[in-house]
Amino acid sequence: MPYIKPKLANIIHPVIMFKLTQGYEPAMEPSQLYAVTRGQWKMDVNRSKQFKYALACDAGLVVEVYEIETWHQSNETMSEAELLYRRAKGLHAGETGRIEFVGKIAPEEIRKKYNKTNVVKYWGRSQTPFKYISPENL
């Protein structure tokens, strides 16, 4: 199968990109990918509420797009199965001072725009596991 270079993302919506390092596996179940992406992050909850979409990213490529519905303090909304999975993968689980979102797969037109796109230019040299992208600030 020939290599197809992913198109470059053109972000026009307020998004938070999440760098999935620990716990991410390309063949994981959708529910596991959601659990890894949605929490638990050391972020400012008030700032995070300004962003509508979450981009789950691996190696500079968007692997899934979620529509963020609400933000919560860590451990408020995760199921026991999600917490067990996160602990088994060595991820933060139930720590204070962290937040998590509740959301769903983004609408198809949004997924089509961002899923499987290259977002390396937006990360720059940042080492943080998440990045806020406001189109008006680009």
Name each region found by the language model.
Residues 67, 77-78, 112-117:
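Short conserved micro-motifs at the rims of enzyme active sites and ligand-binding pockets
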Residues 63-71:
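Short beta-strand-centered aromatic/proline hotspots
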